[in-house]
Amino acid sequence: MKVQTKWFGEIEVSEDKIITFDKGIIGFEDWKKYTLVYDAEKEENISIIWLQAIDEPTLALPVMKPEFVYETYDPVVEDELLKSLGDDIQDDNIRVYCALTVPQDITKMTINLKAPIIVDFDTMKGIQLIADNSEYQVRSVSYTHLRA
């Protein structure tokens, strides 16, 4: 299917690449379907990925695998909350992303470690949860960690 985006123009997205967030994403609860946009040639080493809404061209969130910034990232979430991803969750199918805030001065970029976005690539379901870890913040410095 063809998807209109503000930042990437018209892109082709196959149905099996659409991630459904039954509850939406915090702050964007009305939009349920997304896809990940990135440079496929750099897939293994890419740091910033875009979570693009299928039905809203202007809604694209920069996200990142948190281990690029915090190697020991381990969010604590209630297992009950993960049930919306499917009945048989396998660790190999799960990916965790965290939203980025990228201001004009990129050195002030932050990552939201408090509310990870969890995707099961077997069921293509996603959910954003609030981690119980008190050490994780909504705005954690990320630029200096990326540069290291």
Label each residue range with its predicted role:
Residues 1-72, 82-128, 134-139:
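A cross-family signal for N-terminal binding/gating loops and helix N-caps
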Residues 75:
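Residues that recognize and position ribonucleotide moieties
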